[in-house]
Swiss-Prot record:
Tissue expression pattern: Ubiquitously expressed. Isoform 1 is only expressed in testis.
All residue ranges annotated as the ELM2 domain in the record: 179-277
Record keyword Transferase present: no
The protein, known as: Mesoderm induction early response protein 1
Ranges of residues in domain SANT: 282-334
GO biological process terms on file: chromatin remodeling; regulation of DNA-templated transcription
Residue ranges, annotated region (Disordered): 1-171, 365-511
Cross-link annotation Glycyl lysine isopeptide (Lys-Gly) (interchain with G-Cter in SUMO2), location: K238, K419
UniProt keyword annotations, A-Z: Isopeptide bond, Nucleus, Phosphoprotein, Repressor, Transcription, Transcription regulation, Ubl conjugation
Biased composition (Polar residues): 128-143, 397-408, 481-493
Organism: Mus musculus
Pfam families the UniProt entry points to: ELM2, MIER1_3_C, Myb_DNA-binding
GO cellular component: nucleoplasm; transcription repressor complex
């Protein structure tokens, strides 16, 4: 089946350097029909192939020598075998005195000459065969190009490197990836002379260290047997010691220390443990009530800093005893009562500031704020209004209709004394308090100026009449807070102030 050439023209357009969209013709679309019968025929044809002949051919080729097999598939004897390549590599390794560059140049030049000679001979053969049959020349030339080996050592080495890289090998990381342990004189810091606390021949510790255990002097099996014998019951135990223990082996430090003092003699160590006056298990001495109270106060003040607790609160005990008592105290009912009173168990964020879970902290703060806040009943509007109305009623009853009080004329209330103090009950009052009623009318004009203009005087008279009618009606209660909205509670201040101001105006007119 011949393949269409690239240069052949297509119905949609000729193939040039530029890309064009493929436009199929009508004839191509007519034949573009997928028939399933053709697939079935192809499957039947493939099923008719005989695999037995292929197996026989493979078996015959397996017994065939390599030279015949190469010639069967069209390869000449010039192709080097793997065995020959290994022999050549061994010969090259033996020649250490020769220069590698000269060998490569000479080898490449000599092989290039051989290739030129072979090319010239090949060209002569091609010219002779071209006269006889042009198709044979093309096939021979293609086969020669395929079969021609690469004889230059430079290319051979590259091919070997490529073959080695293609093989599966373990990944070896680079040296930069590896971590180097910085140990040695070059990584040590140079400490100045005055910084060091100790001299060259001075000992850091005044007393010698005491050996407590050496695991190399006695095998582990004997140590286990010794610990079992040391923890064996005698039947004379009382109290807590009488409680049966598990089958596990306890690491009895006192028994091991006795074994070290006896030069790892197990029998002598067991005898000393049994007849020693000091108990094998030291019980914690009882703490007094004062010590317990001081310890709890230290926990409140310093947290779990047992060094500060011992130094400032419980000086009669050591730091180790404070730690041991803390774990016993935490399992007692005294700790539960202490935690309820001080909430010591939940204030972990004070001791560990790195904790990022602040939910417990927020709950604790909200509960403590709610408990510390004393519940006080809020002042109602009715109470404040009643108290203010009682004050105003007492002030009005102390005066007669002419505005003169029972005590004398010197206690007449001026207009400026009436001030609105209830307008800002819910908010801050202004710094400069101005009197509500002055010599101005309700529209904001002064009375002296209004007398000169008759029109303005008529308007003020009408406004006064309207104001009298409004005062006769029942006053609506109104409360004004700092934001300017109406709110109940301070309406009496405003209404009483207006009523008293009007009452004083009537007194002046009567006078």
């Amino acid at each position: 089946m011949a393949e269409p050439s690239v240069e052949s023209s297509s119905p949609g357009g000729s193939a040039t350097s530029e890309d064009h969209e493929f436009d199929p013709s009508a004839d191509m679309l007519v034949h573009d029909f997928d028939d399933e019968r053709t697939l079935e025929e192809e499957e039947m044809m493939e099923g008719e192939t005989n695999f037995s002949s292929e197996i026989e051919d493979l078996a015959r080729e397996g017994d065939m020598p390599i030279h015949e097999l190469l010639s069967l598939y069209g390869y000449d004897s010039t192709v080097r075998l793997p065995e020959e390549e290994e022999e050549e590599e061994e010969e090259e390794e033996g020649e250490d005195d020769e220069d590698a560059d000269n060998d490569d140049n000479s080898g490449c030049s000599g092989e290039n000459k051989e290739e030129n000679i072979k090319d010239s001979s090949g060209q002569e053969d091609e010219t002779q065969s071209s006269n006889d049959d042009p198709s044979q020349s093309v096939t021979s030339q293609d086969a020669q190009e395929i079969i021609r080996p690469r004889r230059c050592k430079y290319f051979d080495t590259n091919s070997e490197i490529e073959e080695e890289s293609e093989e599966d090998e373990d990944y070896i990381p680079s040296e930069d990836w590896k971590k180097e342990i910085m140990v040695g004189s070059m990584f040590q810091a140079e400490i100045p002379v005055g910084v060091c606390r100790y001299k060259e021949n001075e000992k850091v510790y005044e007393n010698d260290d005491q050996l407590l255990w050496d695991p190399e002097c006695l095998p582990e099996e004997k140590v286990v047997v010794f610990l079992k014998d040391a923890s064996r019951r005698t039947g004379d135990e009382k109290g807590v010691e009488a409680i049966p223990e598990g089958s596990h082996i306890k690491d009895n430090e006192q028994a091991l220390y006795e074994l070290v003092k006896c030069s790892f003699d197990t029998e002598e160590a067991l005898r000393r443990l049994r007849f020693n006056v000091k108990a094998a298990r030291e019980e914690l001495s009882v703490w007094t009530e004062e010590e317990c109270r001081n310890f709890e106060q230290g926990l409140k003040a310093y947290g779990k800093d047992f060094h500060l607790i011992q130094a400032n609160k419980v000086r009669t005990r050591s730091v180790g005893e404070c730690v041991a008592f803390y774990y016993m105290w935490k399992k007692s009912e005294r700790y539960d009562f202490f935690a309820q009173q001080t909430r010591f168990g939940k204030k972990k964020y004070n001791l560990h500031p790195g904790v990022t879970d602040y939910m417990d902290r927020l709950l604790d703060e909200s509960e403590s704020a709610a408990s510390s806040r004393a519940p006080s009943p809020p002042p109602t509007a009715s109470n404040s209004s009643n108290s203010q109305s009682e004050k105003e009623d007492g002030a009005v009853s102390s005066r007669n209709q002419n505005g003169v009080s029972s005590n004398g004329p010197g206690e007449i209330l001026n207009k400026e004394e009436v001030k609105v103090e209830g307008l800002h009950v819910n908010g801050p009052t202004g710094g400069n308090k101005k009197p509500l009623l002055t010599d101005m009318d309700t529209n904001g004009y002064e009375a002296n100026n209004l007398t000169t203009d008759p029109k303005l005087a008529h308007m003020t008279a009408r406004n006064e009449n309207d104001f009298d009618e409004k005062n006769e009606r029942p006053a609506k209660r109104r409360r004004i807070n700092s934001s300017g909205k109406e709110s109940p509670g301070s309406s009496e201040f405003f209404q009483e102030a207006v009523s008293h101001g009007k009452f004083e105006e009537h007194e002046n007119t009567n006078d």
